[in-house]
Amino acid sequence: MGKIIGIDLGTTNSVVAVMEGGEPKVIINPEGSRVTPSVVAFTADGEPLVGAPAKRQAITNPKNTIFSIKRFMGRFYDEVTEEISMVPYKVVRGENNTVRVEVEVGGEKRLYTPQEISAMILQKLKQTAEEYLGVPVTEAVITVPAYFNDAQRKATKEAGEIAGLKVRRILNEPTAAALAYGLDKKDKELKIAVYDLGGGTYDISILELGDGVFEVKATNGDTHLGGDNFDQRLIDYIADEFQKQEGIDLRKDPMALQRLKEAAEKAKIELSSAMKTTVNLPFITATAEGPKHLVMEITRAKFEQLIEDLVARTIPPMEQALKDAKLRKEDIDEVILVGGSTRIPLVQRTVEEFFGKKANKSVNPDEVVAIGAAIQAGVLSGEVQDVLLLDVTPLNLGIETLGGVMTVLIPANTTIPTRKSEIFTTASDNQTSVEIHVLQGNREMAADNRSLGRFILDGIPPAPRGVPQIEVTFDIDANGILHVSARDKATGKEQSIRIEASSGLTPEEIERMREEARRHAAEDRKRREQIEKLNQADSLIYMTEKNLREYGDKLPADKRAKIESALERLKEVHKARNFDELDSAIAQLNQAWNEASQDLYRAQQAAGAQTSDGASAQADSGGVREADYEVIDEDDKDKQ
């Protein structure tokens, strides 16, 4: 059985980990980092870049550099208006009100689903793991925010499938963090709160640990709140101040906006350890009078003032989670901070003041979720023993009933996997079919909740209203993904639905995208081979020119002409990037040089032999003259 990897697919950064020798290990990527930026870019020639290389070129290519794609996963276009305003790339409405990202590849406009972009990030993490392990990787545990709904979880699973990964489990991020924190504390009984504030989402989960059982008691959160929002407050503040001074709105220039975004993110990070920082962006824009520079000092106090209301938004979910878990603040033994945004001092103070205790900072907030995912992967593969994970569904699940009311079948914070059935009936006489409208959310009215799908059960025998008995069954698997069926008890006729994600991706579309991803991987390999071949040709051209300068005058004229002809051909083929002829041009030049080298070697040998013969002749002709000498007797010497 191959290794199952653990992946934290984050809004800002992603991490991959694996169990090795019974211990979870974060895998270092080809760039030498433990975290991979969740960024995908498309260059002018259509080459996709993922991770640090994509992030590095974002300033010069803002419209084709995609980041924070997690905020669009499994969402309708109408739900992401705030997110769209925060990114410089183009987000358009797709079929059925879905989200599509528009990029320009090789002069052509192309639409990508959020799942396809996420799949590119997952492919990079998959390749990182394969290079480290030395074997193919086909299975993974992928984490999601605890408050992700059914559609968002399905979209994440689809992204994994497109990337060529069988997703063995969709795991809630706070649960993964608790798993990583509590693995060596299995013999203790603890009640812990996991406060997870990442780049784009916020979760709070209350768990009980004891005897190797990790039981989630309640979860709450906000999938529209994270570090991106803090960055945006800084961006708006800096842009507004600059506009007051110069009369120019930098947000209207995609390149300036991207520079501003990077500067805001950097300032936010610096203000976690420093009391003030300076944003310095030379040549940020230009007018008829010349270039304009942006230099602005920002204090921690100002930053905290800008984000105070956002941090305050994390308090009501904490209160609700404690209420749902039927616990008081004093009952919590440990508060674990997860996600890069928890490094912000105001966030830490808010959490510590709420719970009345110091937060536990023993875990790395960037890596702990991936480590937990790797542990869960170890549980699934049998590598980790004596660990039982009991997670919950974050939101109410139910159906629409008479009067547009949502009738709940599975309440929020129910332990999963679970199955629940309930009997419903018809609303009018002689009704032969019923529409089952499946909903997710915590509001009373159906219209205020998230629609997961509709299906029709027909063939019901005509009868007065209230007589037919229709059994509706909700089945949630361990990934938190829902399956619904309806059965007429009189006829036994059944209709079921596997709720499709709001992304609208069918199994056929997922397979097409997976095939496309495989093709892109093959294209990437081919492109890499071509670049290596160009580099080989480049080196050969350089070495040949160097050798001709040094030894050219020692070569026979015909051989030198042959080398120069082959060299010119290779230069032309290299310049034209003619890959069909590159191999033969390299071989031709190598052969010409080898033939000339043999002649040169023989000439040097012959020259060496002549030198040797000349030396011998000189010795034979008495070239050594005897010196005159006188014998001195030792006694005579003493006398002298």
UniProtKB/Swiss-Prot annotation:
Q: Where is this region: Disordered?
A: 600-640
GO molecular function annotations of the record: ATP binding; ATP-dependent protein folding chaperone; unfolded protein binding
Q: Give residue spans, biased composition: Polar residues.
A: 607-619
- Record InterPro entries: ATPase_NBD, Chaperone_DnaK, Heat_shock_70_CS, HSP70_C_sf, HSP70_peptide-bd_sf, Hsp_70_fam
**Residue ranges under compositional bias (Acidic residues)?**
629-640
Keywords per UniProt: ATP-binding, Chaperone, Nucleotide-binding, Phosphoprotein, Stress response
Q: Give the modified residues of type Phosphothreonine.
A: T201
Pfam families from the UniProt entry: HSP70
Q: What induces it?
A: By stress conditions e.g. heat shock.
Alphabetized SUPFAM superfamilies for the sequence: Actin-like ATPase domain (SSF53067), Heat shock protein 70kD (HSP70), peptide-binding domain (SSF100920)
Instruction: State the family it belongs to.
Output: Belongs to the heat shock protein 70 family.
NCBIfam families assigned? PRK00290.1, PRK05183.1, prok_dnaK
Looking up PANTHER family in the UniProt record yields:
HEAT SHOCK PROTEIN 70KDA (PTHR19375)
Task: Give the protein's function.
Answer: Acts as a chaperone.
Please give the name of this protein.
Answer: Chaperone protein DnaK
Q: Which gene encodes it?
A: dnaK
